[in-house]
């Protein structure tokens, strides 16, 4: 009798302005059965456009500094959108941004992850 491994896939939208980070995320998502990257993008405008266009990832993983915005205006815009579901939001940031964590968490983010980080 063979043992089947059941893996629940999580759909996630990733936004990071660093091309190397996006490449690493793409590779990780391609090799990990638990992650389905619905989008890997570099700007807040692209995040908003995709959400307004009907993309419904379960999780948003957002860098605190994107190519066109910082996390605060982006979180406010996401919060103001009339979307019928609430994705889980994770924000990645540099340790120097630690004083901003409380503000980030009050603007709908559920978790923060400090960079640099490593993927298993």
Functional labels for PLM-detected ranges:
Residues 8-21, 25-29, 60-61:
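Conserved acidic segment of CheY-like receiver
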Residues 40-59:
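Acidic, metal-coordinating helix/loop segments flanking the phosphotransfer/catalytic sites
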Residues 43, 70-73:
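Acidic catalytic/metal-coordinating carboxylates
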Residues 60, 85-98, 109:
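A short, hydrophobic beta-strand element within the central beta-sheet of small alpha/beta folds
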Residues 72-73, 95-112:
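Alpha4 helix (beta4-alpha4-beta5 surface) of REC/receiver domains from two-component response regulators
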Residues 72-85:
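Short amphipathic alpha-helix used as the core "switch/output" element in two-component signaling
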Residues 115:
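A Lys-centered signature of the CheY-like receiver
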Residues 118:
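Receiver (REC) domain switch/active-site region of two-component response regulators
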